[in-house]
UniProtKB/Swiss-Prot annotation:
Cofactor dependency: Zn(2+); Co(2+)
Residues that span the membrane, as ranges: none
Binding locations of Zn(2+) 1: 66, 99, 162
Annotated binding of Zn(2+) 2, by residue: 99, 134, 348
Name of the protein: Succinyl-diaminopimelate desuccinylase
Cofactor binding comment, as recorded: Binds 2 Zn(2+) or Co(2+) ions per subunit.
tRNA processing among keywords: no
Function: Catalyzes the hydrolysis of N-succinyl-L,L-diaminopimelic acid (SDAP), forming succinate and LL-2,6-diaminopimelate (DAP), an intermediate involved in the bacterial biosynthesis of lysine and meso-diaminopimelic acid, an essential component of bacterial cell walls.
Organism listed in the record: Xylella fastidiosa (strain M12)
Pathway(s) served: Amino-acid biosynthesis; L-lysine biosynthesis via DAP pathway; LL-2,6-diaminopimelate from (S)-tetrahydrodipicolinate (succinylase route): step 3/3
Active site annotation, chain numbering: 68, 133
Length: 377
């Protein structure tokens, strides 16, 4: 087929279920070093990270991706083995084909071609890969970003290869992301027999008004760039499984996706104040996954729009929707961040795939973006 097809297949065949890398980064580093990249392997705990750079000085463009994948689930549910790439009906099937080994392969091919055409390019081209994007995201880009911050590393632009397209390659340009804040609420009650409720304190009954207030709260109206903040309860657990026992405790997990009108500390304070109004005996544990970020109108967005329109045939939708990405750790370094990648319809699903035509186009798309940012005068 082609270089990008072969490299994507090579990556898919390595079962790098998070936080495993399965040799993906070593193989990529060897290729990058052959064309003049300086490669640094940053290992934190069980996580592999690769920081590869070519050139020097400003501006600095980072291509950001991950080599880990989500578990495939039952192998028998797949039409073909998820770690044996298979080409069928114009698509390449395998775990990571769309999220995001196809993009990583395209990054490498685009970088190689760019350096052939522009060996003495201005500024710095960097590639940052991690094996901890799909998992806890603690020892991956989060930790690398802190290392880069301590070194005083400047980053001007970050291009993340997450599968951002909706129906066709390049139809959507991700220009920001909402923040993510998770919490686990533990409500204490008193266990007892359901026939003697006066001898017990049912934590479910006690918590229901507070949970109703939480889910009914109108946080904000959003704005032209971000949707409104939302809170969703994801898990509730209480009881022994018997229908004649009042539980002694309740556990509720919930998550907020919030726009820049809020910060994590403000949201935490608001929720604590709301819970305190209901007189619960509770504890609350928070996990801050990342603050929101937004790339304003400027050179990066303008060039990305022009390039995507060339490939998709129409101007892209510019969006801040969807979940989180590792760009949330790069944005606080002062970088403007966008996300451009293949269609996301099959990601994290059985029979994940990428359209072969899109895969073949990705290196050209990324190379043009790199050239417009680093080599255009």
């Amino acid at each position: 087929m082609s270089e990008v097809f072969d490299l994507t297949c090579d990556l898919i065949s390595r079962p790098s279920v998070t936080p495993e890398d399965a040799g993906c980064q070593a193989m990529i580093a060897a290729r990058l070093e052959r064309v003049g990249f300086t490669c640094e392997h940053l290992h934190y705990g069980s996580v592999a990270n690769l920081w590869a750079t070519h050139g020097q000085g400003a501006p600095v463009l980072v291509l950001l991706g991950h080599t880990d994948v989500v578990p495939p689930g039952p192998i028998e549910a797949w039409t073909s083995n998820p770690f044996i790439p298979q080409r069928r009906e114009g698509k390449l099937y395998g775990r990571g084909a769309a999220d995001m080994k196809g993009s990583v392969a395209a990054f490498v091919i685009a970088a190689e071609r760019f350096l052939v055409a522009h060996p003495g390019h201005p500024g710095t081209l960097a590639i940052l890969l991690t094996s901890d994007e799909e998992g806890q995201a603690i020892d991956g880009v989060r930790k690398v970003a802190e290392t880069l911050r301590q070194r005083g590393q400047r980053i001007d632009w970050c291009l993340t290869g997450e599968p951002s397209s909706s129906e066709r390659l390049g139809d959507l340009l991700r220009v920001g992301r909402r923040g993510s804040l998770s919490a686990t609420l533990h409500v204490k009650g008193v266990q007892g027999h359901v026939a003697y409720p006066h001898q017990a304190r049912n934590p479910i009954h006690l918590a229901v008004p507070a949970l109703a207030a939480l889910t009914g709260r109108h946080w904000d109206d959003g704005d032209e760039s971000f949707p409104s903040t939302s809170l969703q309860i994801s898990n509730i657990h209480a009881g022994t499984g018997a229908n004649n026992v009042i539980p002694g405790a309740l556990e509720v997990a919930f998550n907020l996706r919030y726009n820049p009108h809020w910060s994590a500390p403000r949201l935490e304070s608001e929720i604590v104040a709301l819970l305190d109004q209901h007189g619960l005996d509770y504890t609350l544990h928070w996990h801050r996954s990342g603050e929101p970020f937004y790339t304003p109108e400027g050179k990066l967005r303008r060039i990305a729009r022009e390039v995507l329109e060339r490939f998709s045939g129409a101007p892209p939708e510019e969006s801040t929707g969807g979940g989180t990405s590792d760009a949330r750790f790069i944005a606080p370094l002062g970088a403007q961040c966008i996300e451009v990648g293949p269609v996301n319809a099959s990601i994290h699903q059985v029979d994940e795939h990428v359209c072969l035509a899109d895969l073949e186009a990705l290196p050209d798309l990324y190379q043009l973006l790199i050239e417009r940012l680093l080599a255009e005068h």
